[in-house]
């Protein structure tokens, strides 16, 4: 089966969660990749954090999907600007970045 690089989608914390002003969760969805091993890092304003990443699951098209979550305090979220989900697959890093000011 040919190697396929993942598609990455990065979601900011929900407005509902931010309105509660206690925590902020970022979600990185990683879809349509093969083979299954992936590693995920989170980079916040240049510093690396580790999130919680699910084990890859096989999709109906025989490729894999996974997701990674980064939980922050609301004050942590509001004190940084650039949030990046960095996925390493098959020796290649793919990143998706969001800016808090644009959310």
UniProtKB/Swiss-Prot annotation:
Keywords: Disulfide bond, Immunoglobulin domain
The protein's name: Ig lambda chain C region
Family annotation (SMART domains): IGc1 (SM00407)
PROSITE patterns the record matches: IG_LIKE (PS50835), IG_MHC (PS00290)
GO biological process, one term: immunoglobulin mediated immune response
Disulfide links within the chain: 28-85
GO cellular component terms attached to this protein's record: extracellular region; IgG immunoglobulin complex
Coiled-coil residues: none
Organism: Gallus gallus (Chicken)
């Amino acid at each position: 089966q040919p190697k396929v690089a993942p598609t990455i989608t990065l979601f900011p914390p929900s407005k509902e969660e931010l309105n509660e002003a206690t925590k902020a969760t970022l979600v990185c969805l990683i879809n349509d990749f093969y083979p299954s091993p992936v590693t995920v890092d989170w980079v916040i304003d240049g510093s690396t954090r580790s999130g919680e990443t699910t084990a890859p699951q096989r999709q109906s098209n025989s490729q894999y999907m996974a997701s990674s979550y980064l939980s922050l305090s609301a004050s942590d979220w509001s004190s940084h600007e650039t949030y990046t989900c960095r996925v390493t697959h098959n020796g290649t890093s793919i990143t998706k970045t969001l800016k808090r000011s644009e959310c």
